[in-house]
Amino acid sequence: MSGEGLVSAAAAPEEQAFEAGLRPKNLDEFVGQRKVREQLSIMLEGARGRGRPPDHVLLSGPPGLGKTSLAMIIAEELGVPLRMTSGPAIERAGDLVAILTALTPGEVLFLDEIHRIARPAEELLYAAMEDFRVDVVLGKGPGATAIPLDLAPFTLVGATTRSGLLTGPLRDRFGFTAHMDFYDAAELALVLTRSARLLGVQLTEGGAAEVAGRSRGTPRIANRLLRRVRDYAEVRADGVVSREVARAALRIYDVDALGLDRLDRAVLDALVRRFGGGPVGLSTLAVAVGEEADTVEDVSEPFLLRAGLLIRTARGRVATPAAFTHLGLEPQSDQLGRSQAPAALFGEDLPAS
């Protein structure tokens, strides 16, 4: 994986086996998301006491925060099988019927990227979630008939990074909804300490803090950085991941103290040094860094916005005083005023000049 890919929250295919070995097995092992864990614990304990499947669960939030792990934990806590699929994999209603009719009583069905499920399949899911029934249509035209099929009671766990794309009827059928937030540095240090123990890595408190501070609030990124830092410690140090070793390793991989990578810094550098802090249109900024506009908007900007280094206004992108400081520069005298300009409606710019 490239240096820039190190701080991407998206899961790479080759990471599946690695992540599986680090996943928590129960709610007690799951670090962070305290309120979500407490709410889930109460719901699951109540369901076990009644001897019935719990309500359907919708987990939303950015990638890499543990939605898949929680789905696995729900099944484990209930002592039932888990079946996993994703919205893009269900292209036709028939695909969903095949999955639903194969479920055993009490089974947990995990549907990742549920916002991307095909509309015909989504509409079929309504009755399945509410009444544990699907209507299979036989034939076409006026002679078509609907045959109801009863399903075994099950619990659907849906996960989405784009909860705003869910339709109202689908959202309303979830009895339990939870939004997962980014982790703070202390929580990420706990995640790293646990992962280091499972991987047999000697990680000092300072080393954990250093990696946590560069992990963008995301456990997946923290664990990925830990692997690279471990390699450096074994090859160029004494095998112990200390604060100094972590800094040296991540310097090689172009991940700075805030978790910015090469592209992030290139965007900030162009915005500050070439355009005086902005405002500048997205297309112009993308040309300046030699990337597609979509790449800048989808890959770099989300974290720069969250880190308070950049804002989007009706006139274009503007660097904040913190961006100047991060690059070792003094903010311009009028930069505070420019960075407090009204944000663009829906995050859009006027056409770049």
From Swiss-Prot:
EC class of the enzyme, as a word: hydrolase
Stated name of the protein: Holliday junction branch migration complex subunit RuvB
Annotated positions binding ATP: 22-23, 64, 67-69, 130-132, 173, 183, 220
Subunit annotation: Homohexamer. Forms an RuvA(8)-RuvB(12)-Holliday junction (HJ) complex. HJ DNA is sandwiched between 2 RuvA tetramers; dsDNA enters through RuvA and exits via RuvB. An RuvB hexamer assembles on each DNA strand where it exits the tetramer. Each RuvB hexamer is contacted by two RuvA subunits (via domain III) on 2 adjacent RuvB subunits; this complex drives branch migration. In the full resolvosome a probable DNA-RuvA(4)-RuvB(12)-RuvC(2) complex forms which resolves the HJ.
Annotated compartments: Cytoplasm
Positions contributing to DNA binding: 312, 317
Segments of this protein annotated with the region Small ATPAse domain (RuvB-S): 184-254
Role of this protein: The RuvA-RuvB-RuvC complex processes Holliday junction (HJ) DNA during genetic recombination and DNA repair, while the RuvA-RuvB complex plays an important role in the rescue of blocked DNA replication forks via replication fork reversal (RFR). RuvA specifically binds to HJ cruciform DNA, conferring on it an open structure. The RuvB hexamer acts as an ATP-dependent pump, pulling dsDNA into and through the RuvAB complex. RuvB forms 2 homohexamers on either side of HJ DNA bound by 1 or 2 RuvA tetramers; 4 subunits per hexamer contact DNA at a time.
Gene Ontology annotations for the cellular component aspect, listed alphabetically: cytoplasm; Holliday junction resolvase complex
Phylogenetic lineage: Bacteria, Bacillati, Actinomycetota, Actinomycetes, Frankiales
Gene3D superfamilies: 1.10.8.60, P-loop containing nucleotide triphosphate hydrolases, Winged helix-like DNA-binding domain superfamily/Winged helix DNA-binding domain
Reactions catalysed: ATP + H2O = ADP + phosphate + H(+)
Keyword terms of this UniProt record: ATP-binding, Cytoplasm, DNA damage, DNA recombination, DNA repair, DNA-binding, Hydrolase, Nucleotide-binding
